[in-house]
């Protein structure tokens, strides 16, 4: 079953900021994972995140493109079968995870 896909506004901007080849790579990866975005321990493609340094990313999953260094962090809204993209970017110095933590804090406080 294909899950619906939702981007928070900042994640749309992240996607737009990538060059064309990076955008194609991450879009293909997202579409693949979207077929079954559950965590790998539930038979899906998602790689669970826990705590990265002092950043609580529990409940989030990642898509990792090793060759290009791109990462996408998403969370599942199971009641709506929605895959919500939180951040897309380069892994450089864990920056993508720091950004995800900040955005999740904002989402959770709304």
Q: What annotation goes with each model-predicted range?
A:
Residues 1, 59-61, 70:
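Residue-level marker for the onset of beta-strands and adjacent loop->beta junctions
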Residues 5, 61, 83:
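A broad, low-specificity signal marking well-ordered, structured residues that form hydrophobic/aromatic
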Residues 10, 55-58, 69:
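Short, conserved clusters of charged catalytic residues that mark active-site
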Residues 35-64:
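A short, surface-exposed loop/turn module that caps and links secondary-structure elements
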């Amino acid at each position: 079953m294909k899950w619906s896909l939702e981007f928070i506004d900042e994640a749309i901007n992240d996607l737009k900021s990538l060059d064309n080849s990076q955008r194609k790579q991450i879009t293909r990866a997202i579409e693949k994972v979207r077929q079954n975005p559950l965590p790998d321990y539930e038979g899906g493609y998602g790689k669970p995140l826990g705590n990265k340094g002092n950043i609580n990313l529990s409940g989030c999953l990642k898509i990792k493109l090793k060759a290009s260094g791109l990462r996408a962090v998403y969370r599942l809204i199971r009641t709506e079968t929605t895959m919500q993209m939180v951040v897309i970017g380069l892994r450089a110095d864990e920056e993508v995870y720091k950004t995800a933590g900040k955005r999740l804090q904002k989402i959770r406080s709304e």
